[in-house]
């Protein structure tokens, strides 16, 4: 079941077609780690996360951010089945990594901020509303194993 209207889907897919996964992914994960420093504990293997510049310049942060957004691209192709799309990732993050599901919501909100910065006037309030709905749905799907 989907809560996404045809307009939501169009707004999401239209903007997504213009997103550079490497740039936006690195920026999103980097900002998450800077703004919410407690999230750094999940990335001990990434090397130096000692300052904002170290985080934003860290190649492992950029690579993992791109991986996260690549996964999000799969969700965008399957907006009507976010829970199914993220079933295995939910299990991994819950059972093995023990990630607080609140972090998924935070990451989604940071992504919306990054998209607004990168896409300026094109990121209208209507586009933002559709993206907020999508990142909330993704956060819920990723947290579904916890429920």
UniProtKB/Swiss-Prot annotation:
Keywords: Heme, Iron, Metal-binding, Oxygen transport, Transport. InterPro entries: Globin (IPR000971), Globin-like_sf (IPR009050), Globin/Proto (IPR012292), Hemoglobin_b (IPR002337), Hemoglobin_oxygen_transport (IPR050056). One of its GO terms (molecular function) is oxygen carrier activity. Red blood cells. One of its GO terms (cellular component) is blood microparticle. One of its GO terms (biological process) is hydrogen peroxide catabolic process. Residues 3-147 form the Globin domain. Heme b binds at residues 64, 93. Heterotetramer of two alpha chains and two gamma chains in fetal hemoglobin (Hb F). Belongs to the globin family. Gamma chains make up the fetal hemoglobin F, in combination with alpha chains. PANTHER family: HEMOGLOBIN FAMILY MEMBER, HEMOGLOBIN SUBUNIT GAMMA-1. This is Hemoglobin subunit gamma. The gene is HBG.
